[in-house]
Amino acid sequence: MKRLYQQIVMLLASTIFGWAIIAVAAFQGIWIAVSSRYPMAFDEAYHYNLIKLHSDIISPIIYQQPAGQAPYGALARDPSQLYHFLLSIPYRLLESVGASEFVTVVTLRMFSVAMFCWGLFLFRKLLLRTKASAAAVHAALLFFILIPTVPLLAGQLNYDNLQFPLVALTLLSTATFAKQIVQRKSWLGQAMWTVLLSLLGTLNKFTFLPIMAAVFTYMLWMIWRHRLHGRKRTTFKQWQALQKHTRRVQLGAIAILAVLFCWYYGVNTVLYQNPVVQCHQVIDPSRCASFEPWERNYKLAQTEQSVSPNPLRFSVDWTGGMFYRLFFTINGATGPKRYTNHVAMPIAMAAAVLSVCGAVITLRYLRRILAHDPVFVMILFAGMVYVVSLWGRNFNDYLNLGQMVAINGRYLHPILLPFILLLIAGYQHAFRLMPGVKLVILLLAIALFSVGGGITGFIHYSDADWYFEGQVFLVKLNDLSRTIISPLFLWRA
């Protein structure tokens, strides 16, 4: 048993296995991108229409509110524009050659798949900077891509697919900055890259703000801890040591991004007391009625509903809602049945049991896991700030609207990998002298995650209404695949 365990660990730790995981993730994303009828459930129509809107203007930002109704909210004050601007470039090319909607949507979805796979590569690189073994890191990546909503999101148009690599890239830059400080190397250039990436992330999606806050807090703490504050002469020498071209690029990019950051978040805060404004704060509510999230919240706010202000009770419901929407498979807004969703019980039950037991075990060994691992501490700190921010925003909506809204598991994707790795580390410490037990847990977990995990749930639960219309080959391919994986779902009988 011990020898078998060692062989499996060697396989998991191999670079080939790491690349194989990324290849499987790409395959899954491409499958979803090619098969799924437009629009998919995760606001894909909203993002596609904004891409088209960006293609009609020269400026990379929308600085003037379009006339008429506001189906996309207060666009002129919305900072989340980077993803839509970037994809508007290939959209223009596709439009110029007269590509069909099928070709256009699938092609743009491929860019989303590429962004996600880039993020997976960067997160692998980041997590290998921790004290965790390569086998543990690759196991975390494997379980992550088997979460059903991960390939579903990767294969559609959504700015979360760009947010994923931006979070990884920023944290990777922060880790490099910290390493240079500890080793007493020149750190100023890396600090500037980190600031640049943080600003860029906030212009892709406003939920990057807590990540930026955590990163800046950590950077300032590192500077203070190593007594680098006040050393103007040293900082000036580092500045002079940077190549002129690098200095100009960094300063120019930071200046542009900082101006945009202040234009959106700064002006919003000053004028509307909110860095992310509500539609009715900027334009007439009658025009906002066509913006579905605003209309939903507006109607809920008009209805007096008493809710328990107990944060513990909310947290239980919030955790359950997040968990369900991490592990469900869902179709889009078209077809006879809209937003039909299913959860495969084997993967859901396995994830629940492993998470709860793993959390208890991890708390027992947390100090030992994080000892002498500042990179892991930094990553988890940023992740915790993000989760608390997300929870706080949802709790505030709950108190003001009387219902839980926007409880979506996919919002956890950008920071989920480090926490999966933390749970794996907990199991490793708890059973460090029992390789046979670790092997059984690992193989059983992989087996259960295979039932409904990745794209298997999509293939099993979907039907012709879930696929692009008129694409007979796609229907036959999914039907054949459903037959092949049907033995995994015998538990339903």
What are the language-model segments listed below?
Residues 221, 225, 246-357:
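Membrane-lumen/periplasm interface segments of specific transmembrane helices
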Residues 189-206, 211-216:
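Membrane-interface alpha helices of multi-pass inner-membrane proteins
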Residues 1-4, 178-179, 211-258, 367:
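Perimembrane helix-loop-helix junctions
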Residues 28, 45-78, 82, 92-95, ...:
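Extracytosolic helix-loop segments that constitute the early lumenal/periplasmic catalytic or substrate-binding loops
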Residues 106-131, 169, 357-361:
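Transmembrane-helix motifs of polytopic, lipid-linked glycan transferases
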Residues 41, 149-163:
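Short acidic/glycine- and proline-prone juxtamembrane loop motifs at membrane-interface regions
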Residues 97-102, 123-146, 164, 185, ...:
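Transmembrane-helix signature of polytopic, membrane-embedded enzymes
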Residues 13-44, 52-61, 71, 253-270, ...:
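Transmembrane signal-anchor helices characteristic of membrane glycosylation enzymes that use polyprenol
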